């Protein structure tokens, strides 16, 4: 399964972000490193949750499909926010002075994700519960990243992660992904029904 590589990859992005922050590499990491850290951590938590539940309910088609379809939705913010920064009037970045527009573009992209979740829920109601789970994580990301965008509270943690060996962080992410796959698969196994005992005549 490729899921451990996804979580390991997200952990690698955290590693690059933290090491760039410690090295003072680039104004974006210096401005938003803490916010990116919490956003990525919540993304990992979201993926672990929806993938575990997708495996657990793999015998229930609607639930399984719903959780699997939330995975690209969680990824949607990253490319769409970059498109906003490239082309959207009022959010387009033309120079260093426009870098503070990065966070509003991320929040607008997440707001669009929530609009998609709302539209799916209005159409399918109880069958769309997996999207409500993903929506809860998206709301948590919006609040955490919006509040902590310029906060110094996460800086000590970011420095600590930046000073860790990269392999430790990436392999931890890989292990979390592997453990999630194993746990979800086992949770979805059919319960063994004991064979009836033949009665003596």
Please place each PLM-identified region on the residue numbering:
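Alpha-helical membrane insertion/targeting regions
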Residues: 1-201
